[in-house]
Amino acid sequence: MEQHFNTPAEVIDNNMKAGEGKAHLPLGKMILLGIMAGAFIALGGATSSTAAHAIDNVGLARFVAGIIFPVGLMIIVFVGGELFTGNCLIVMDVVGKKVTWFECIRNLIVVYFSNLIGALIIDTLIYFSGNLDYTGGLLGAYAIKVAVGKVGISPLKGITSGILCNILVCIAILMAAAATDIVGKIWAIFFPIMAFVVGGFEHCVANMFYIPVGMMAAQNPEYVAKAQEAYGLTAEQIQGLTVLHSLNNFIPVTIGNILGGMVFVGIPCYFIYKKKWQKWHEESKNA
């Protein structure tokens, strides 16, 4: 019977070949692809926020946002881009000795800050486009509320939520690689990414949109007044939206995303599908 998808072993093989290429990209290309990916994820965040901001029921709001947000990763898969969270899977090449730790870390650092640049570009465009004026400024107030919630997260929650998030993101990437046609790839991306949004898990690159755009919105008195009225936020909470306080989110969430992608997905997949278990078993018996 004809097979219309790649097997898990084939997926890991293909992902490792792609990971080796990612680690050895020229610096300029790596930066440009990172900027693109950050911008695409930010566009997913912006449009999903617009769709969900006026919905009072939390579960329904997350469901609606979850339907829209996956477009960001879909664009990256089909158009191109280097996404920090997905590139955590390069760890498979490190374990397989195709890439050095230095090359892996270099890629992750360059891509991380390139993603940030791309997200900040979209943050700025969204703010000055008037998009946050929707519903009498409620979207701007919503941006503030989301950012306040994110900078107030505890380190433990940030790490554990980041782990859960990148398990799903990396699974989405591997599932998309398993599909052999466009429709299959779309659905393969859609459900895991929707799950992480509905679950409310923390994604460091998505937060490069949510936190800065909330900080920008906090400079607008109209949005601030609306946030205080609609969500009961205090002046102190809103004033806490600073670059320094944003690190309360970015540091633990980034650590969690790395652990989720590397320890919970990348390394186990390598050992399941690439390690020569029979040879290892024979060596163990002879030892």
Spans of features found by a protein language model:
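Alpha-helical transmembrane segments and their helix-helix packing motifs
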Residues: 1-287
